Amino acid sequence: MASSKNSDESEKPQPVMLVAIDESEHSAYALKWTLDHFFNNNSSAFRLVLVHARPSATSSVGLAGPVYTGAAEILPIVDSDLRKIAARVADAAKQLCIKKSVNDVIVEVVEGDARNVICDTVEKYRASILVVGSHGYGAIKRAVLGSVSDYCAHHAHCTVMIVKKPKTKH
């Protein structure tokens, strides 16, 4: 009798590696590092998903309370700029993937706070691993701004890799 693969094994979905991207050099480094270490030789054990959290125009302008005079004119301009930035971020990430011969990539741009968008996308794709770049903020700046990577490390329901860009020596 011929041996056949277990049908459960052949139909098992490929695990997902999710990489959070933004316009920073730290994000670009984290994506490049991920591609070099997990997606070389045109094969990988993972499906690649990239997510960019696009802030809303109101959060970017800081309009949490009553709208000030002139906001109606400014918000569409800010929103247009944020959409252009998001398109550039997504395109640059896609180009880097293509350069590294990774063509089967999903890129999502989602409006919202980066921490929530990233953790929600982990859940949506049932990611096994989340990769985020480290901006290398000091303790005070991290305490004031909050760290997206720290938040994700504590709230994402998967393994989280924080990729630090090596400091250049002078």
What are these regions (language model features)?
Residues M1-S7, D120-H170:
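Gly/Ser-rich helix-loop-strand patches that form or flank binding pockets
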Residues S3-L75, R83, I98-V105:
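Small/aliphatic-rich secondary-structure junction motif
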Residues K32, Q95, D150:
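Active-site phosphate/pyrophosphate- and oxyanion-stabilizing loops and adjacent acidic/basic residues
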Residues A57-S59, N116, K169:
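Flexible, glycine-rich phosphate/dinucleotide-binding loops
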Residues D79, R83-D91:
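Short, surface-exposed alpha-helical segments at coil->helix boundaries
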Residues D104-V107, V160:
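Generic structural signal for residues in well-ordered beta-strands
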